[in-house]
Each structure stands twice: as structure tokens, then as C-alpha cells.
Amino acid sequence: MAKEKFNLQDRFLNILRTKKIEVKVYLVNGFQTKGIVRSFDNFTVLIESGKQQTLIYKHAISTILPAEYIMLMKTEEEQQEQQEAEQE
């Protein structure tokens, strides 16, 4: 079985996007914005707040603060279920 590569940044942003969790994004210049992560790629994050969209370059981001706790790692039970599914 090949070891699954774990990309923390992509996983974090994808959970925020799929669960539509509100975030505060702090930029390196001190500016901050709030909204929902709508999309992201290797270089940018698209934040939506109301009817306003903001495309932010990742190199300009200092901190992303989600409104709720994000479970990044799979629990042992989820890992076991995945292994069983792969064996079938």
C-alpha cells in the first residue's frame, strides 16, 4: 500500500471550503478580512463575504483563523475503515 501524501495547507483550506466555515484572514500588511473560502489554488485563496469577493495571494497571508475547530488528522477509527476498504 502506497503511503498517502499529506498536504496540510490544502487539507485545511479544503475543509474550510467544503464546510463553509467563516474565517478571518490576516495579511502581512496588517489588513484583515472575514468571509468564506470559496476556492483556492497553489498561489491564491478566494474569500467571499456577502456579495464581495476578494482574491488574496497566499504569500500575502500571515494567518487564517477559522470560526471553529478544524479536525485535520483522521481518527484511528477512520484510518482503520480506510484500510479495510482498500483491502476489499
Curated annotation (Swiss-Prot):
Name the Gene3D superfamilies on file. Answer: 2.30.30.100
Classify the source by domain of life. Bacteria
Source organism (scientific name): Fervidobacterium nodosum (strain ATCC 35602 / DSM 5306 / Rt17-B1)
Which keywords belong to this entry? Answer: RNA-binding, Stress response
One GO BP annotation here?
regulation of translation, ncRNA-mediated
Q: What is this protein called?
A: RNA-binding protein Hfq
Which InterPro entries would you find in this protein's record?
Hfq (IPR005001), LSM_dom_sf (IPR010920), Sm (IPR047575)
Q: Which GO terms describe its cellular component?
A: cytosol
- Give the matching PANTHER family: RNA-BINDING PROTEIN HFQ (PTHR34772:SF1)
Recorded GO molecular functions are: RNA binding
